Curated annotation (Swiss-Prot):
One of its GO terms (molecular function) is 2-dehydro-3-deoxygluconokinase activity. This is 2-dehydro-3-deoxygluconokinase. The lineage of its organism: Archaea, Methanobacteriati, Thermoplasmatota, Thermoplasmata, Thermoplasmatales. Its EC number is 2.7.1.45. Probably activated by phosphorylation and inhibited by dephosphorylation. Optimum temperature is 70 degrees Celsius. Catalyzes the phosphorylation of 2-keto-3-deoxygluconate (KDG) to produce 2-keto-3-deoxy-6-phosphogluconate (KDPG). Is specific for KDG. It is an enzyme of class 2 (transferase). It comes from Thermoplasma acidophilum (strain ATCC 25905 / DSM 1728 / JCM 9062 / NBRC 15155 / AMRC-C165).
Amino acid sequence: MEEEMMILGVDGGSTKTLAIVFDERSERIMGVGISGPSNFTNAPRETAESNISDAVRKACSEAGTDLDGIGIRVFGLAGIGDSREATELGKDIVRSIVGHADVYSDGLGAYKFANLNDDGVVFAPGTGSVGFIKNGSDPERFGGWGWFIGDEASASWMAKQAILFAEREHDGIAETGFLDVVRRYFGMDLYETVYAISKEKIAKRVVAALAPQVSAMARSGNRYAISIFEESSSYIADLLNAKSRIFGRSGKYSVLGGTMLAGDFYRDMIRKKSSVDVSIYYGYQVAIGDVLIGIEKKGSISVDLRNKMIDQLNSILENKKEDIKKFLFLDSVPTS
């Protein structure tokens, strides 16, 4: 394969790193690599480097190529844009692994994936949460205040709500059903858990990984778990409705992130409460946006091409059961 036809797109965040090698000539994803977190602002540089390198190596190996065979390399990393220092650190990490590359905020890839070049809003509730609005220029960020006070509707926020309900059950205020769930998940007394989290002895991504159990409880009818999703969906609808007034209800509105895997019940809540049409995607698909940025360096992109890549990625991931369970917390790839 000719070098100029190969594109590497990498999305790195607080929970996982996913790399895609795409052949522009055949319009096919040739390789996919998944590894652990690469948000260098809340993990050691060595961890971020190792996981980015691992994901890239896996994707290249599956594609039957190496970095010399890839002409365009686009990285979308959490932490880029947080500060000048963070941005330089992220770019330096990428250079140390692949040499020349275009490095952007993971939000730019997320926006490109969901809305392409249309004006509108993308809200991304994953491990944390952040939003982007585009109105005739480059997407601008909003939200993303961090998990101590902000990151509403994110997996870490949902996990914190679950711990709060566990505290209420512990204190005899309400039988929420969360106390045993939280104890089993963290493997320690509730007081010890709260102390460890407050002292940052338990990583944000580990706390956030409790969210799938909250989803399962909601699907089984636990009213306290359902209330978490009611509050979360109301927040998402409120922000979409508020931002839509800027566009006079026109524009494109998308929500993407791992929390969208909670189930149809949650996606339906968001759509019913929103006054605009909402497209919903999943966080593991965002690396496609980085590939689309690469394609635009020489050509054009379309919804049809994006959707074709989604189908290809889903098909490839179905054959990576161990990786999607370990890094994406999925037993299978969603079909809707």
